[in-house]
């Protein structure tokens, strides 16, 4: 899915960010900040279903929620952390490609890629309603009040959870340059953590300004011996705010990792 072209474009974008020393001022008056650089240490490893094309991941009240993609295979499910066993709560229509999810209060929200519809469920997976939106749906998270949504562009939109209307947006910038292909999102300690599609990097973003304040590299997380022909890109961020645990995985990966972030 759109992977090769996007990878080439992302590489070009990141190279430009690293090599240019200055840029002309634009109408956004972007703030140039040198982001902190982080690596990781694996704390625990858990099984993950290789049938789960992970699009969204969230850990809430001891429950790991996962939304998966692919035409005809997209689901909303709960995952037992220790065993990796999946309990499918809802299956999307075969005409829909599932994307990001988030849990807010007693509702679960799930985006679709190109169908312009978000499904809203109760905590048992019963469909409550559908909400329409323009453009593509990619990542979704919440600060506990509002939703934050990505569409693969440089923007993250602030969305009203009751009406699904956009009430604002930020442009994600790295060293003053707008970064595209913002994908899976997670709200962690007042910041938006976002995967850049097809890369092993997560950006730590100021939700007010869009400025990238940190970059976490997850290079070499999945070992070659753990890959198969179906193994796809790094994707999926979840945060257990009670125990301060961070979980990451990828599409059709056989492992889900609990990681500690280490500043370089």
Which residues fall in each region the model found?
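Bacterial signal peptide processing site
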Residues: 18-21
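A short helix->beta-strand "capping" segment at the edge of beta-propeller domains
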Residues: 30-51, 81-87
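Short loop/turn segments that connect beta-strands within beta-propeller blades
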Residues: 79-84, 122-126, 160-164, 206-210, ...
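Conserved beta-strand positions in repeat-built beta-propeller and related beta-rich domains
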Residues: 66-70, 108-115, 149-153, 194-198, ...
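C-terminal motif of bacterial Sec signal peptides marking the signal peptidase cleavage site
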Residues: 13-16
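Beta-rich, blade/repeat-based domains predominating
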Residues: 50-60, 94-104, 133-144, 150, ...
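A short beta-strand motif characteristic of beta-propeller blades
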Residues: 42-47, 85-91, 125-131, 168-177, ...
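Beta-strand-rich domains and repeat architectures in extracellular enzymes and scaffolds
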Residues: 43-75, 90-102, 138-139, 250-256
